[in-house]
Amino acid sequence: MAAWWRSSPQIRGREVVLVALAAALLAVVLFWPLAAHLGTDIPLDLGDPLPQSWQVAWDGHALATQPLGFFQSNQFWPLHDSLAFSDALIGYTPAGLIGHGPHAAVVRYDLLFLFAFALAFLGAYLLARELGAPPWAAAVAGAAFACAPWRLEQGGHLHVLSSGGIPIALFLLLRGWRRERAGMIVGGFAVASWQMALGFSLGLQLGYLLLLLGAIAAIWWWRAGRGGRVGIPRRLIVATIVGGLLLTAVSLVLARPYMRVLDAHPEAKRSQVTVSRYSGPLRMFVAAPETSLVWGRATSSVRDTLDAVPEQTLFPGLAILLLAIAGLGWTGYPRPLRVGLGAFALALALLSLGFQEHGIGSFLPYRLLYEALPGWQGIRVPGRLNTLTTLALALLAAGGAARAAAALRSRRGGSAATVCAAALLLLVVIEGSGFGIDRGGEALAGYPHPTVPTAPPGLAGLRAPLLQLPAAREDNRRYLLWSTDGFPKMLNGRTSFDPTFFAHAMKAVACFPDRASVAFLRRLGVRTVVVHSELPPDPEAPACTTGSAAPEKLGLQRTRRGPLVVYDLG
């Protein structure tokens, strides 16, 4: 282990640039034709990608226009801290400064989606290289982390796909300590802080992982130091303390608005009922997303038995799993590292099961995280831990690929080993592909990329605050995206929980326009109500029991703007 610690590999800047370019090209190819439809199409579906496009746009808008009121977004007006109703992707704020309007928001989301994939590949590659994998085997690690089949279902969850900061932070910290470079250590904590700013779904995992690794390192140093064999340069200790304080400060600052939301909105808390709903059975690890080229149809019978498919399809990939098992025996990694990665993957898989309210599932270890450790009560989906499971498997898969190629090299020479390396990389990539055979009438269809609905031309420039109807979930998602044209304050919004205030407001306006609903909206300060006649009524809207009234009798000015019926409340 000591010899391995002293043998940090040479990684040239040229190598990093080439791998980054290759990762970007691979992202474009695997998710083609998305790159040909930037700004008009969006990955996977018209669900969460629309409000997440709005989130990044708001981040840039808020930084430029109201930095002291960053979390006071235009959704769910007049509620406070409404940006903190879900992971806010604050780490992407610089991207939000570029461009304006719905088209720019969708272009931005499409590019960030591809960027997240490429960064995950690059991060796992660099970490595998630092651990001792040769370049081509590290490429297998990059593909295994970025292309794991379960990630195909996360196309609408940019905060989950954006995991590249985790391996990059670990790479910088490990390399900084091995090469005794204080700047690299601080850089590692800076990247960890950026990952935290993308959302607590993954940031919390990384924070606890760093605490665990720090504790292991401290124990190792204490045991080795008892014999006087280990001395730590002061500058490394200072860099670690400074970096740790930076990460802690960023985490605390980001947590404050979320804590205020929990205090103001008890319905935002992740109850045991909610967590158990998104926890899953063991079979979810053999359920691949429907969009998986290799495993989508093969695992459909298992997938159909799951209650929350987007959160419970956690299949890591058969090729990745077999390579990871082989990697447990690769001597290029020191034995403690191999054992640690294997144990870590198993422990995380167990934690990913979450827990159930009753029965034997109520004793699963995730309950300990939920009940005893700070932060975990804010996590809705235990399966998000699959990100770290996949990283551990990817690093072991690099070892398995290196072991297989070495065996071929000793028997059949270098050419066979090269072919083996390329074949294994291709196998992992194909297994994680989202192309579909005979999908939607196409012989070979690309990863789903629906066209984004455009805003009606009469929507821009209306007096705010406003309410848009109907207000079904899918409607509110598109309203948020359309609101990036000026960010008018509005009652509508979309988040991971349903604010009690909004439910009350929808009940109060069920009969709009009538005297009670108009009086309610005027008391709030709403100035405009927009009815989208081109959209179907919300089937879940509260029923009207009294009937509406003529607008002129209520002091309303009604105008028609194409498909929009606009009511000016005065």
Can you describe what each PLM-predicted range is?
Residues 15-24, 190-191, 229-256, 272-277, ...:
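Hydrophobic alpha-helical membrane-interfacial segments at the cytosolic entry of transmembrane helices
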Residues 27-120, 148-163, 276-304, 356-370, ...:
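Membrane-interface coil-to-helix junctions
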Residues 266-276, 424-570:
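Extracytoplasmic
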Residues 23, 112-131, 135-221, 240-247, ...:
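Membrane-embedded helix bundles of polyisoprenyl
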Residues 8-12, 222-241, 324-364, 410-415:
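Membrane-interface helix-loop-helix junctions at transmembrane boundaries of multi-pass membrane enzymes
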Residues 315-318, 365-404:
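Hydrophobic/aromatic-rich transmembrane helices and adjacent perimembrane loops
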Residues 241-274, 279-300:
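Membrane-lumen/periplasm interface segments of specific transmembrane helices
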Residues 237-249, 395, 401-433:
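Signature aromatic-anchored transmembrane alpha helix within multi-pass, membrane-resident enzymes
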